[in-house]
Amino acid sequence: MTTNNITTLLDLIAEGNSSPKEFLQKIDPYQLSRIIYPRFHGTPDHVLCKGLPIQSGDVNGILVLGKDVANAIATNKLNKQNTPSYVYSTPGGDVSDFSAIQTCSAYFTSNPARTEFCAVQSVLEGKPTIIDIPVTYHEEDEDRIIELVTSTGITQEVKTKHRWISYTQPDGKTTTVTEGTPISVSGETGEIFLKQLQIDESPIDYIYETLTECYLEAARDEEDPYPWNSLQETRTFSRNRTKLQQAINSSTFIGFQKVLQHAISISAPSILCNVHRPACIAKAKLVSSVITFDNEGLKIASDKEKYGIGLLRDERMWVDQEDIDILRVLLLGPGTTSIENYQKFCSMYTQRHGNRYRKIFATGVGSTCVARTLCMPISKFLPDDFDIDGFAIKHGLDPLKSKAVFNRMTSEREIYHGCRGIRMFMIRPDLLKLWLMTVLRAYQASERVNGQTKITFLLATLTFPEEARRFIHTLEECLLDLWESIESSPVAGVATMLETGGAFISIEDILSAHGQDIEMIGGLVGVNDFTTACLNMNRNDAPKFMIPSYVESAMLKTSPFSSIETTVVG
């Protein structure tokens, strides 16, 4: 079904000449996504190569291969309209790539794993994302000046290294694309194009994105107790008022909302989203709401039971370089510096990280909030080639002691089963308490907004029942420091990820763990965990050869990255 046909069906629904039920019977999610996201006009040509799309949307941008170029674009003094749009690409990455991903228009990588570190971050940011692009990355030390031109013709010069990607076709012909080249990326087809293409805007995407921006602008006024009531007072709303009113009152959006509300009425789903910043939960709230715009202005009718935070991902919140350095100091520990200096970093963590949590909670968490322990391999914060000597000098640490701790902690070979999640907190109970108090204080400050909504803590990499018991014990201590009783606190309980063989073997004992009032209330299993714990395959290696080969030989009916193999997990 073409985009025009889908739009026509929505028009008929808006006019009352067709039903949402009939619409849902005629289309599939892939077809529906064609009207939800921006799409290239017509049939594009000039294809360089193709990978596997994992997040939809079609965009134009300048190819950026280095963090220095991305940071130069993000920190320029031009306004948003005059900031160059760029497509970011790396073969892999770590937490230092997060800022580049947050401000890019799309991301692609040669890595074939859906769980590749930067690809996951890109999907969480809502960026068109493609994995398994068959290109090779190149870099030379020679200096090069890149001229970045905006849509309004303003030029920004960036000094950087010489970088490019290359693609070799089946006939042996190789095409190279240098950093700074204008390209287009399709998150629908997975194709990279060697020219910038015309894009048809989606009114649905425009409405949700613009209203999210309105909320974020209103929320910057920390004196405003409920920013949702102030959307129409923002500059973003003022600039977009006429276009917003037309889009919201369009038959396409009216029909889409009727379809959405019909789906909600017959299945009563909750929109539970991955969250690492306020925009995530703000957009989830908007999607679950009924939005109208009449002579009295914009109206958003929300039901908190229809959306919530399914997974609050602490590890994905670390974007700012200064904040990342704070966490690095804490990971290296109090033995690397003076007590006074270490306490300074603890205070900075509490203030800055707590402020991030407070802004998320103040948005309104909806029906539920599941907060997960810091689930980040150490190698993504402290890679093997990290300049530990320079870092120690910069932040007032003892270089020799810092290097000794660094050498002991780093060089993890199996990073995803390394020292992260509950393992780090068991080794460093001081960090566990610091994290819990930071999250709980932020949630306490938002109790007026969230009412009776409960928070559940989710433990990553848990293997031993004792780990669950110790976490619960520390949690109860923190709760009694902040509330009169544990019963009066907003904590529903504790759950565990099932991502280690030990967790599967000991699941009954783990789920039996409890404290005075807090107990284990459930578990969560996902694709990554299935691959590593059930199949005992490295989750980065598995998609390249082993799993495709098992599917080809009919050992598995489908890839576990698209369905669960019940013969293994029951």
Map each language-model feature to its residues:
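Predominant activation on well-ordered alpha-helical scaffold segments within soluble catalytic domains
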Residues: 6-10, 21, 105, 116-123, ...
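Conserved catalytic alpha/beta cores of large enzymes that bind or transform nucleotide phosphates
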Residues: 1-29, 37, 185, 218, ...
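Short, well-ordered loop/turn and helix-capping segments at boundaries between secondary-structure elements
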Residues: 15, 29, 124, 332, ...
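Acidic, glycine-rich flexible loop/linker segments
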Residues: 37, 54-85, 90-312, 318-330
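Residues at alpha-helix termini
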Residues: 14-15, 124, 303, 481
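Conserved alpha/beta-domain cores
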Residues: 223, 240-570
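Cysteine-dependent phosphatase catalytic core of the protein tyrosine phosphatase
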Residues: 1-75, 174, 191, 529
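Catalytic P-loop NTP-binding/switch module of NTPases
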Residues: 3, 180, 416-417
